[in-house]
Structure formats: structure tokens, C-alpha cells
Amino acid sequence: MLDHIGIDVQNYEKSKAFYKAVLAPLGYELIMEVQGWAGFGVGGKPDFWIQGGKQTIPRVHVAFRSDNRERVRSFYEAAINAGAKDNGPPGIREMYHPNYYGAFVIDLDGHNIEAVCHNPE
């Protein structure tokens, strides 16, 4: 079982603001900052971390689970408004399974960030 993940970002402050806006529709908030790391999570437990001032190669793909499709759409809209690039608008991805509803964006550092809901509408 995965407990947490950390990714490198080039500009800590810009990326921190980006992820605060992008993850809010999924219930995430900035929980703590420790020694150059910002930890985001739900319910007081950070499970997604960013560290600034680092080279961001290789790029990563991180998917955040949502309990409903509206939050996936809100994530996508917030990400685009925060400067992300579209990498797949909200919609069904039947190649994974019939209820796989996801949205994909490329963040400020080129990482593929996704929100996904596995529940039927």
C-alpha cells in the first residue's frame, strides 16, 4: 500500500500555489512545510509532497482518486486556470474499465497529473 509520494519541482513557490489551487477540488490542502518540502493531503495527513529547486527529469505520472466525477471536472478546470496544459479532458477512459472517469494535465514542470473517479455516474 502506498503511503506517500514526493516529486521535484523547479520553482517551489509557484508549484506550491499551483498545487494548492489544483488539489483543493479533491479535498486536499497544504498541511505542512518541512525543510524545503510542502506536504498536501486530506484529513491532516500529507501524502503528496513537492520539493523545490530540483531538476524535474524524469517526469512522473501521479493520479489522485476522487469520489465523484464533479470533483474530477473541478480539478481539471482549476488546473487549466492555474497554468497547466491539457493532457486529456474529463471523460470516460473505457480502455481501463467502463467507469474510469479521468482528467489529465501537465503541471508547471511537465509532470502528468491526473484526477480519476472509478464510480459510476
Where are these regions (language model features)?
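Glycine-rich acetyl-CoA-binding "A-motif" of GNAT/NAT acetyltransferases
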Residues: N112
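Long, continuous compositionally biased terminal/linker segments
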Residues: F40-N81
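Short glycine-enriched loop/turn motifs at secondary-structure junctions
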Residues: M1, Q55-P58, H97
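A short linear hydrophobic-aromatic micro-motif
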Residues: G27-E29, W49, D86-P90
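Core segments of cupin and vicinal oxygen chelate
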Residues: I7-D47
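N-terminal beta-strand motif that seeds the catalytic metal site of vicinal oxygen chelate
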Residues: M1-K16, V62, N119-E121
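Vicinal oxygen chelate
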Residues: N11-E13, F64-D109
